[in-house]
A protein has these predicted regions:
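Alpha-helical scaffolding within the catalytic cores
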Residues: 53-56, 110, 222-234, 265-274, ...
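N-terminal signal peptide
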Residues: 2-26
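Conserved, mostly hydrophobic/aromatic
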Residues: 127, 243, 312, 320
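N-terminal carbohydrate-binding/catalytic regions of secreted carbohydrate-active enzymes
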Residues: 38-115
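Aromatic-lined carbohydrate-recognition surfaces of secreted/lumenal glycan-active proteins
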Residues: 166-229, 263, 278-294
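Aromatic-rich peripheral "rim/lid" segments of glycoside hydrolase catalytic domains that contact
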Residues: 307, 311, 323-375, 380
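A solvent-exposed, charged loop/short amphipathic helix patch at secondary-structure junctions
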Residues: 88-95, 139-175
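Glycoside hydrolase catalytic-domain groove-lining segments
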Residues: 232, 236-239, 244-294
Length: 383
């Protein structure tokens, strides 16, 4: 065990003080966000997540008092294009500047009251909107449709404008509406359920996926341009109550220094962004991770459990959210696979990391903070 500095509120601290854990005496929290309720109800396979100290909703429901995630069609009237149709179909206006913010907020009230019936909801509250990004320049590849459709809207009203004039106006209209849509959504959510830890999934990201370009020379570092772009999202960090970056690992990164660097850089950028808002404290960071390699049901190796869960704890994150989809409870075989994984490598490792975080907090921080690495690029771990 390497002794790490304590993240707490001393007067001379270079870092902002951290908020208290959302669960008492749990400086590092591991939460479950997967629809696994059918494993027990349909197949008689109990996962017993509580036995490993994993925070889970009642009956392992996907949405509940501890963790709730809203997808694009579950909160208000989110505008987007259905890319699967030819030509793409606009839903709720398609682009944010072509949508009704008031109608969206009105529907959103009903959705939150239905999904979060308790006014005292104090769990993780995650909004997963991935169809478009609020910065115009980041709408590349399939998301380029939001730039092209925005330009069409401008050209329709200004047929004599040059392409440059159209693009400048389209960018301004899109970003202005995107900011309003995302920030007003957070404001309303926080007013309705003020104790919830509201934030957007995948924010921040630093787009350090270039391991495909030069695997051997991959450093993991976030491109400086993307760091600058994250700084432009200060309005979003000011409205967020928590940050939910993703540290999903593809199998190509298995058991490699590149995988450790990939995750480490994402965590470092999220923790940097957490310091940017004007609040006295830093924002809590809960990194979304998969216990399996992305797009598979292949278990993370022991080394990659360390590179994800262990590294998040050592870096100073508030916790990890283990995400899964309907495949987890698709059949008895998948449920049994998850149970065996929990009993084998995953569950004991979660216990190890959370206990190490508790002990370090008690002995180094006197129970009033979280241990974290002295240097973001360090490879020190809590266990």
């Amino acid at each position: 065990l390497l002794l790490l500095p304590c993240l707490r509120p001393p007067a001379a601290a270079a870092l902002k003080p951290a908020l208290a854990p959302i669960v008492q005496d749990r400086p590092f929290l591991v939460a479950w966000n997967a629809p696994s309720t059918r494993c027990l109800s349909a197949y008689g396979v109990p996962l017993n997540l509580d036995a490993f100290g994993i925070l889970v909703n009642r009956r392992e429901a996907f949405a509940g008092g501890n963790v709730t995630i809203f997808y694009y069609d579950q909160l208000g009237l989110y505008p987007y294009y259905q890319n699967s149709s030819v030509p793409p179909t606009a839903v709720n206006g398609g682009c944010p500047q072509n949508a009704s913010l008031q109608d969206h907020l009105g529907k959103m009230v009903k959705d939150i009251l239905r999904t979060m019936p308790s006014e005292s909801f104090a769990g993780l509250a995650v909004i997963d909107w991935e169809n478009w990004r609020p910065l115009w320049i980041r709408n590349w590849d399939k998301k380029n449709i939001y730039r092209s459709m925005s330009a069409q809207l401008v050209r329709r009203g200004n047929p004599g404008w040059s392409d440059e004039q159209v693009d400048l106006r389209a960018k301004w209209e899109f970003e202005k509406a995107a900011v309003n849509f995302m920030s007003e959504t957070l404001k309303l959510a926080r007013s309705l359920r003020p104790r919830g830890w509201w934030g957007y999934y995948l924010f921040p990201d630093c787009y350090n996926y270039h391991y495909w370009d030069d695997f051997g020379g991959y450093t993991g570092h976030c491109p400086p341009l993307e760091v600058q772009r994250n700084n432009k999202l200060l309005w979003l960090w000011e409205q967020s109550k928590a940050l939910y970056p993703s540290i999903y690992m593809e199998e190509v990164l298995r058991d490699s220094p590149q995988g450790e660097r990939f995750v480490g850089a994402k965590l470092s950028e999220a923790l940097r962004v957490a310091e940017l808002p004007s609040a006295r404290h830093s924002l809590p960071v809960f990194a979304y991770a998969r216990p399996f390699y992305t797009y598979t049901l292949k278990e993370l190796s022991q080394a990659d459990l360390v590179h994800t869960i262990g590294q998040a704890a050592a870096a100073g994150a508030h916790g990890i959210v283990l995400w899964g989809d309907v495949e987890y409870s698709r059949n008895r075989s998948n449920c049994q696979k998850i149970r065996d994984y929990l009993l084998g490598a995953l569950g004991p490792y979660v216990v190890n990391v959370t206990l190490a975080a508790q002990l370090c907090s008690r002995h180094v921080c006197h129970g009033h903070g979280r241990c974290r690495r002295r240097r973001p690029d360090s490879t020190a771990y809590l266990h």
